[in-house]
Amino acid sequence: MNFRDKAIILKKRNIKENLAIVTVLTQSYGIYSGIIKDLHSKKNTIIYQIGNIVDFCWSARLDKHLGTINCELVKSYSYLIMSNKRNLFYTHSLIELTLMSFKERELHANLFEKWLGNLESINVGNINIKNYINFELLILKEAGYQLTLDRCGVTNCTQNLIYVSPKSGQAISAAVGEPYKHKLLLLPKFLVHNNCEPEDIYEIQAAFNLTAYFFNKYVLIKKKLPIARELLLKSILAYSF
């Protein structure tokens, strides 16, 4: 049993002096893990870094086996990811959310394409809060919990959407939500309108609170949100506005 695909390096865990288990997100087969040998060779040290895009080859005697992998580097992003703390927190938070939200060998083609886009955003120095939250919303959607933020879940109107129902994940208009606002989640304007960016730190905090609620309730269950996510938020709030 073997296959070849384009992949992104998500995780590397050393198991012996010269062996490691590497986990990747493939374009056509979902998350896959395998053993790499000769871990500390000059070539492999360069290839198996978090965020790198690789030509991925997996082989095993049976499909259910862990298997071994061999990769060739397509494009390296590892230096850019390590170049500053925000890039590092941004990438590691999304990696951990991806690994915690999906089982291995589930196909999520949309997720792979979004990952490529985010890596390229790091490459051109264009990572931002809106991209990050939209990625979290995509992870929720791919995990089966899509939020509907473009119209009111009660009236179907598209104006004055300022709340989200914690039960349905649907936007709620100001008029409908006013009597129940203490039970509702805040909906930042920049998640409703494509041409908007966060106006202040309160909108940023509200966006992180919104996705965190649905991750905790429906996806992660007893797992904790990544520490990198908390550090990312702190770094954003410390240097924004």
From Swiss-Prot:
It comes from the Bacteria. GO terms for cellular component: bacterial nucleoid. InterPro entries: ARFGAP/RecO, DNA_rep/recomb_RecO_N, NA-bd_OB-fold, RecO, RecO_C. Pfam families: RecO_C, RecO_N. PANTHER family: DNA REPAIR PROTEIN RECO. Involved in DNA repair and RecF pathway recombination. NCBIfam families: reco. This is DNA repair protein RecO. It comes from Orientia tsutsugamushi (strain Boryong) (Rickettsia tsutsugamushi). The lineage of its organism: Bacteria, Pseudomonadati, Pseudomonadota, Alphaproteobacteria, Rickettsiales.
